[in-house]
Amino acid sequence: MLMLIFINGILLPQDQAKVSVLDRGFLYGDGVFETLRAYSGTIFHCNDHLDRLFQSAEAIYITIPFTPDHLKKSLYKTLEANHLKDAYLRLSVTRGVSEPGLDIGGCPSPTLTIIAKGFSGYPDSLYQSGIHAAVVNTRRIPASALNPAVKSLNFLNNIMARVEATRLNAAEAVMLNMEGYVAEGTVSNIFMVKDGLVKTPPLSAGILNGVTRSIVIDLLKENGIPVIEQAFYPDELYTADECFVTSTLYEVMPVTFINGSAVGSGQPGKLTQMILNLFRRLTAGKKSY
C-alpha cells in the first residue's frame, strides 16, 4: 500500500503527491518544518511542536492560514489514513508558489504537507553501545545571520556538517558556534555529564530550543539531578564522564566516542540510561503529557 501524503488538505497516494517546481520551498528552502513522533497512536508533545512551528513561521513572515487545532487534526488524519500507531511525522509549511525571485510579495498562500511513516525507534543495540560523534569544522550559522529558533527548511548548514561527520565515521556531528563553543548536533541537542553535573549549551549559544531538550531538562530537575545551561568548549567533551544527544527521533541517545576517543568508559553511562528510562516512561503514557 502506497503511503498517503497530506497536501493542502487533500490526502494523495505517494506517487500522486506533487508540489510545484515554482514552490519557494523547492526553489529556496523558504519555509519551516517540524518532525513529530507518535507512540501507540498518540502524537508526543504535539502542542509544543505546533507552537514552535507557528513561532518559526511568524519569524520569517509566513502566515499559516490554519489554527494549531486544525493542524493537529490534520496530523492525526494523516496518521490514521496510513493505519499507523508508531510513526514519525514531518509537517512542512512553505511560503508557497510564486514566480522565481526573492520578493515574497507574490505568494498567495502557503503550501502545507504532512508525511507519516512507520517508525518504532532506533535499534536497542544503539542505545546499548552508544553512537560515535565528531566535532566538525562546519560552524553553526550565527544568530545574527539566521535566528536559530527558526526550524528552517533550508538545512544545508546541517547537511554539510553531517557529511563531515560521516567522513569521520561518526553518526552525528558536534557543531561549534562562531565563538568556538559547543552548539548542537545536526539533528540533536547535546548534553554532557561531569562529576554528577549535567551541562548543556544555552539557547544563547545559537541553538534550536529542542522539544526533547526541554523535556529532558525538566526530567533532570524533577529527579534532583543538577543541570545547568552553560557555554563550554569541545575540550570538555573529551574529559566528560558521559555524553548524550536528544531529539524527537533519537529520544536520549548515548554518545560513547567523540572523534575516536572514548567518552568516560566508552559505554553508555548510568545517568544517561536513567534519563532514557524516565523519558520512555513518558512516551509509554505512564506519566501524563
Describe each region flagged by the PLM.
Residues 1-174, 178-181, 208, 217-289:
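Conserved alpha/beta cores of soluble small-molecule-handling proteins
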Residues 174, 181-203, 209:
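Glycine- and Gly-Pro-enriched alpha-helical subdomains that act as flexible
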